[in-house]
C-alpha cells in the first residue's frame, strides 16, 4: 500500500449567511430542533454564483495559498456535489477547461452526503494503481 496524503486544501465560502432562524420559520419548527439534528447553525449561500463558479473560486484559493500546486500537473479532477446546475458536461470538465488542463481524466460524483468521501476513495484507488499522480478532489454544494 502506498503512502498517500492530502498535500493541500483550499476553500471558498459565499458571503451571504443563512442561519437556522430562516429555516425554523419556513418549517414551523425551532432553531434548536434543526441544530440538534444537523449540528449546523449557519450556512453560506450565493444568489449570483453557480456551482461551477464556486468550485473554480475554491481551486483558485488552493493555488494561491500553495505555490507547489501547478494546475498543469493535475491529471484527474473529481468533483463531488449534490447541486449540479447541469448534468453534461460535468463540472469537472468545466474546471479542466477553465484552467486549460490537458491530458486529464474528469469525473463528477453525485452521491449525496457521502459524495466527498467517495471522491477521496476514488482518488486513492487511482493513486494506488498509478493511474493518477496528482488528482484534484473538489467538494462543492450550494
Describe the residue ranges of each PLM region.
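Conserved catalytic cysteine-centered active-site region
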Residues: 37, 41-53, 82-134
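Short glycine-rich or small-residue beta-strand-to-loop segments that form or flank ligand, phosphate
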Residues: 75-82
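Hydrophobic/aromatic beta-strand patches that form the interior of the parallel beta-sheet core
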Residues: 7, 58, 78, 107, ...
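Conserved "HGTGT" condensation-loop signature of ketosynthase/thiolase-family condensing enzymes
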Residues: 1-75, 99
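Conserved beta-strand-centric core segments of catalytic alpha/beta enzyme folds
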Residues: 1-21, 120-142
